[in-house]
Amino acid sequence: MNFATWPALLVVDVEGNGTNPPDLVEVAALPIRDGRPDKSTAGWWLTCPNRPVTPFATRVHGLTDTDLADKPAWTEIAGKVHTFLGDAWICAHNAHTDYRVLAAHLPGWEPAGVLDTLRLAKATFPELGKYSLDKLIEHVRPDLSEAPGARHRATFDAYATAQLLIAMASRYDTWDQLVAAAVPPGLPGAPEPEKDPTLW
């Protein structure tokens, strides 16, 4: 895989307040440049949700209402996040969730495409059986020594997802092959289905 052929790509992870639909509490966006996660130009935002953080959500990511009380409201940072994401490709683990939540919070935003490391892992490791982020970290053993934060925080999970993407991408020869394996049907960037040549 020649990483120089990749378009602009941000690995994203979001954490919510636990309601349905969720209010965002944390967003991370980590660029991949030359086959490496670039923490020096990453975007990271904490935001105070409109509704309280549920106890379950706090048990997952560790963020409480007290932690977020002095953080800006989403309306104050949405423009910055929108500008940062731009029209780059994004990647996430179980990307339907992150894409759907971000799209709901960023009207008018549309990435060039969406890579899903969950879908990619199923294509790359069909024998694995389970494809949670923890299971893939255990199986692939990516270098997480420079991962910021802790598991289930957006910055850590984005970094881990980036390292998993890079490791799995090395098994594909071209960007187009990676896209075919990693973009879920119906999401931006999905390859067009081949037309039946007998139809006109």
Give the residues covered by each predicted segment.
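Active-site catalytic microenvironments for nucleophilic, acid-base chemistry
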Residues: 105, 123, 139, 164-171
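Short, acidic/small-residue loops that bind anionic groups at enzyme active sites
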Residues: 111-121
